[in-house]
Amino acid sequence: MTVPDFFDPPTRQYTGELIPPESNDFISDENLFNYQAKIIRDLAEKQSCIIVGRCADFILRDMDNVVDAFIWAPVTECIKNVMALEPLSEKEAEKKIKKINKHRSEYYRYYSCREWDDYRNYELCLDSSRLGFEKSAEYIKAYVEIKFDIKL
């Protein structure tokens, strides 16, 4: 978990405001996020769905029928996974992972005013290296079945 730097520039929190197409700000990052948030909320209100990233846990924080999961793995495991998918050296894979995680963290902090890797933001945190991808998915499925008393 990272410690917030109080000298970082202030972050913005999602308000749900949508900017209309005729506005000069329509193509802003802020407006793109707001439209993504609207779509995420609309989907979650209408049907069961799995949303990876995009601050979905924060956007849906006031909904009862949601499971917020943070799936992670030690950097050594992430490096192995990246190297299995791409022809990168260990150093290159680690650099790529750090860059992606930095972007994820900054994006999450900017729109939610929270820390991406803070376990308190999620009801379920899982180290995927312990069970592997398939068993981790089964674990999450079992959790959903127990929480909502349903059979998937």
Give the location of each predicted region.
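ATP-dependent small-molecule kinase phosphotransfer cores
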Residues: 1-48
